[in-house]
C-alpha cells in the first residue's frame, strides 16, 4: 500500500529517489509555463524525458481501463513532444502501485490496461530498478 497523501508527496519521494540514483531532475512550475507542460524534466544516462505525475486515490489492479485526470492540453503536449523523438510519459500513483503510461491520445482520459500502453510497478524502487 502506497501512502502518498497527494501528488506533491509522491513527487517529492520520486524526485529524491531519482536524484539518489544520479538522475538530473528539474521540477517544472506549471503556473509559469505553457499549457500542458509536464511536472518533471529528467535526464538519465544522457536521455532526456518529460514526466507528468498524477496521484489517484483508489486501486489500479483488476481494471480494464484507468481513468487519468489529465488537464486540457496535457495529452496533446506529451504526444506532440514524443512524436519529435523525446520520451514522454505519465506516472500515475495509485494506492496499490504506480502505473507508467506511454504518451498518446486516449479517448475521454481512459487508458486501456495492458496492450503495451501501461506498465505496473509496486513502488518507486521497482520503478527505478
Regions found by a protein language model. Give the residues of each.
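Acidic-basic catalytic patches of nuclease active cores, encompassing PD-(D/E)XK
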Residues: 1-31, 84
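Hydrophobic/aromatic beta-strand patches that form the interior of the parallel beta-sheet core
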Residues: 26, 51, 89-91
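Beta-rich catalytic cores
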Residues: 36
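Conserved catalytic cores of phosphodiester-cleaving nucleases, focusing on short active-site segments
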Residues: 40-42, 48-58
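Mg2+/Mn2+-dependent nuclease catalytic core
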Residues: 57-81
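Nucleic-acid nuclease catalytic cores
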Residues: 79-108
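Intrinsically disordered, low-complexity terminal regions enriched in charged/polar residues
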Residues: 99-129
